[in-house]
Structures are given as structure tokens and as C-alpha cells.
Amino acid sequence: MLTRRIIPCLDVRNGRVVKGKKFKDIVDVDSPEVLGKFYSDCGADELVFYDITASNEERKTSLEFVTKVAENINIPFCVGGGVNKLEDFTDILRKGADKVSINSSAVKNPELIREASLKFGAQCVVLSIDAKKNEEGSWSVYVKGGREKTNLDAIEWAVKGVELGAGEIVVNSMDEDGMKNGYDIELLSKITSLVNVPVIASGGAGKKEDFYEAVNKSNVDGILAASVFHFGEIKINDLKKYLKDMGVEVRL
């Protein structure tokens, strides 16, 4: 049975972890290294750090926090935001990250996925997709931290990303982000049925049952959340025990 991963997501702005709703209403939480160590000690399987203003400000990821995180935790972690070329992958991986996430830059230059996969291995390349549902029922891809709509269909883009060499897909529902109403099961199910790499659910966790539903109904490999962890609403150990009791294989 596949072991599912519980992954806290830490959005970083100006060297601090922050959290908002639907990419707005930003609240300060803590420093990346302190919160990262806390989650590492509490049983998280992996961490994801996004420098959420790097792409919109057209700058590189802040590497200072990457070094500090690597020195403080003992679980894998992924870093994204402002990754535009192979050298950015090299810099982030050398600072201690295990994976690099690309979003806006991959839309602008899809070949970056292939180039990075060939140089560093598909396991290091994570395609992050910010998706928002349209009135007719499809999902559009957004870039620059959710600020700019593209003409890409989110499901088609996920499939294309895997074809190019992405080793993992993070699917973030902008409609559900920070709303705590549950994950976008419909979108996740469509993507997991079409790709053969791990898919991570993001956006919408509000209670333990939402995590179970994401695994049970959409067959995702990992479940990512932010505010329910940051503000102590759900404890990772409690969540894992609940999932285990529900028949989900997790690492305790």
C-alpha cells in the first residue's frame, strides 16, 4: 500500500512565513527555520517553501532561508518561487533543498522542465500549478503568485508537464486556498487519472476529514496544508493517527 505524505506548506515573504486567504489577507506566522524545525520534529513527512513574491517581483528565490532550513531539519524539503533557469535549480539544491518547484517560469518556458529533469533528475523537479475554476467548468492556470491568468488549461498543463519531465505535480486550488472547505476533489481526480507521477493536493484543508477525502476520493500521493497547521487547528501526529485508523498508510 502506498504511504501517503503529510506536507506543511510555508509561504515565505521578506524572510517570514505568512498565510492568507485566496492569495490575499496576509498574516505573519513565524521564521522559516523555526517553523520548519517544529514541523520536522512533529512528524511531517516533507516541507514545501514558496517565496511567494519572487516571481511577481521578478527576482530570484531568497537563498538565506534555504540554508537555515537545511541546517535545522532532517526531512526532505522543496523550495519554489523565482526559479527561472537551471542555475537557480543548482543554487537551491546546493543550499540543501531536495526538490525545486517551478510554476510561472515553466509556463513561460516549458523546456525548463525538460532541461532540469535531464540535469538533476525528475525527482528534483516539481511542477506547481495554481488553478482556478472557470464558469464553464474548466480550470485555468494562473501565474505570478496567482495574480495573472493564462490561456492554459490546468489539466492539460499537468499532463504536458509530466511529458516534459516533471517528477511530481502540486495542484493548488485558488478557489479553495485558505477557505477550509475541503480540497477540489474533482480537479485532483481528473489529474491523478491522467498522470503517472505523484500528485500533491493543495488548497482547502479545514478538518481531518478533508485529508482523508482527498486521499480516498482523488487518490493523491500527498496532502499539503498551511493554515490548519500554522495556527494549531490540526496537529500532524493526531492527523496521522486518524488517517491510520481510517485505513490510510502513513508514517507514524
UniProtKB/Swiss-Prot annotation:
Cellular localisation: Cytoplasm
GO biological process: L-histidine biosynthetic process
Chief localisation class: cytoplasm
The EC number(s) this enzyme carries: 4.3.2.10
Recorded name of the encoding gene: hisF
Pathway terms, separated by semicolons: Amino-acid biosynthesis; L-histidine biosynthesis; L-histidine from 5-phospho-alpha-D-ribose 1-diphosphate: step 5/9
Catalytic center residues: 11, 130
Stated role: IGPS catalyzes the conversion of PRFAR and glutamine to IGP, AICAR and glutamate. The HisF subunit catalyzes the cyclization activity that produces IGP and AICAR from PRFAR using the ammonia provided by the HisH subunit.
HAMAP family in alphabetical order: HisF (MF_01013)
UniProt protein name: Imidazole glycerol phosphate synthase subunit HisF
Subunit description: Heterodimer of HisH and HisF.
Family to which this protein belongs: Belongs to the HisA/HisF family.
GO molecular function, one term: lyase activity
Family matches, as PANTHER family: IMIDAZOLE GLYCEROL PHOSPHATE SYNTHASE HISHF, IMIDAZOLE GLYCEROL PHOSPHATE SYNTHASE SUBUNIT HISF/H IGP SYNTHASE SUBUNIT HISF/H
InterPro entries: Aldolase_TIM (IPR013785), His_biosynth (IPR006062), HisF (IPR004651), IGPS_HisA/HisF (IPR050064), RibuloseP-bd_barrel (IPR011060)
Gene Ontology CC terms: cytoplasm
TM helices/strands, residue ranges: none
Keywords: Amino-acid biosynthesis, Cytoplasm, Histidine biosynthesis, Lyase
